[in-house]
């Protein structure tokens, strides 16, 4: 998974908080 990169900063923060392992820039 992971954010598209150009999504909302809030969305990225949520990913970092709830699923940090899936957050890969």
Curated annotation (Swiss-Prot):
Hemocyanins are copper-containing oxygen carriers occurring freely dissolved in the hemolymph of many mollusks and arthropods. It comes from Maja squinado. Keywords: Copper, Oxygen transport, Secreted, Transport. GO terms for cellular component: extracellular region. GO terms for molecular function: oxygen carrier activity. Coiled coil: none annotated. Its main location: secreted. Belongs to the tyrosinase family. Hemocyanin subfamily. Hemolymph. The keyword Secreted applies. It comes from the Eukaryota. This is Hemocyanin subunit 3. It is found in: Secreted, Extracellular space.
